[in-house]
Amino acid sequence: MLDLSLPSGLRDLLPDHSAHLAELSSKLHDVFSRFGYRRVFLPTLERLDVVERGLSPAALADVMKFVEPGSGEVVAIRPDITPQIARLYAARPDALPSPARLCYDGPVLRAREARAGRPREVYQAGVELLGAGGASADAEALVLLARSLERVGLKAPRVEVGHARFAEAVMEAARLPERLRSAAWEALSRKDRAALAAAAAKGRGSAEAREAVPQLAGLFGDGALDRARAIARAVPEAAASLAETEAALRIARRRGVREVAVDLGEARGLGYYTGITFAGYAPGAGAAVARGGRYDGLLARFGRPGPAIGFAVDLEFATQALERVNGRGRGVRPRRASARGGRARARPR
């Protein structure tokens, strides 16, 4: 008998659900356009070396690759669209002068599920601001994210802001032994003060830096910026990243973004993001519907160095958030992977 089931982690989207995704994408592109972002369409397949050049080490396991029958070339199904944008920007300076504001939507496919029950194929819409650095560009991305979430119908969405270099600067100043660094970052991702303190006690840095390491787990919620300022006074290496964060927040707030939270102990995206990071949340939701940040190191990998910042909205997460808010239940669940499938760590967006 013919097996009509789909591979694990994939699913069909029926007409009603497809219409919701299309409507969300249309609303997002309306906002993107008003901010001056121009839409591009990109292929689903890329050469493997292009894809790998644009991913963090943790995301390489998410690449689905195969040998193209005709050419014998190794190609990959995109697990993320940002590297494609970087490749396009580097390849076409004639058509894309700096700064370039580009937007996109489309599916990405990852080799493994990010979490049990989550699909491997994710529909995204996003923006990239290429060739613009500084607080003004950071704030533009924050404001655009907030306006985008409002436009799709999420009332009082919350934007959470961090900085990739703040915790990293503190960890480096504490001079943790090489064998403990990975464990310390894992502890920070769990907000585990005790484990951070144990790792810091073995550090060879200043007493102030070692004392600051467990405090990273508390740099969220009310008073987070005050606590971060105290750390930056004790650990001057962290001061620049805090100043960048506060500058972007001041501009974003002047432009009307009010629901902003801070988490400067965020460990997501280590090795990929180089500056401010942010996530967008629906009211009452624990999972982010959008993620992004500054990734100034990426464009140089493709031969056109420069600053860059962007974010992507998970269209299905956004749809599900709207369904919760409106009391409807049209969510679509993917076919679950077997226990052998394990967990995936996708690129941090």
Curated annotation (Swiss-Prot):
Gene3D superfamilies: Bira Bifunctional Protein, Domain 2. The keyword Transit peptide does not apply. GO terms for molecular function: histidine-tRNA ligase activity. Disulfide bonds: none annotated. GO terms for biological process: histidyl-tRNA aminoacylation; L-histidine biosynthetic process. Pfam families: tRNA-synt_His. It is found in: Cytoplasm. One of its GO terms (cellular component) is cytoplasm. Residues 327-349 are annotated as: Disordered. Heteromultimer composed of HisG and HisZ subunits. This function is generally fulfilled by the C-terminal part of HisG, which is missing in some bacteria such as this one. Belongs to the class-II aminoacyl-tRNA synthetase family. HisZ subfamily. This is ATP phosphoribosyltransferase regulatory subunit. The lineage of its organism: Bacteria, Pseudomonadati, Myxococcota, Myxococcia, Myxococcales. The gene is hisZ.
